[in-house]
Amino acid sequence: EGGTYGQLYASPNLIAANGTWRLPFRGYQRRHDFLRRGASYPEDGEFRWACWEPDRLAGIEAKAEGRVTLIERPCSGRELLLNFRTAPDGWIKAEIVQTIHTPPQPVEAHPGFSLAEAELLTGDSISEAARWQGQTDLSALAGENVALRFHLYKAKLFSVSI
């Protein structure tokens, strides 16, 4: 059951229970600045639980179409694994791009790992490999620093592993 609150006072510890992560909190309808606005102390609030699926506490979301580039990191040479969820008509595509420069400049995709070669990822997966023309192998990039550029449409990206 959802709710909307002006004030939240949360416990500092996540609790694992029934296959979810839970956080107890107390919510009040009044905003945090209620005293400055001349209001009295809030009436009794209510205790609730905020719940998350494991491994999905935070993520990047595109409610329509969006793009994000993550800073460079060493490539393991195995696969690019994604933890994501899309709407029924949503998708994600991944590119592996050259090292990002400062100040920012356009960067090109590594050959074989471009947007044009990327396959759509759809649905809901905790760990699915990105594919480029049916291939997932990144051994050609092993040990190189690469940046990752994701194109999302009605999708949430929770984590990546390269």
Give the role of each language-model region.
Residues 1-162:
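Carbohydrate-active catalytic/glycan-binding domains of CAZyme proteins
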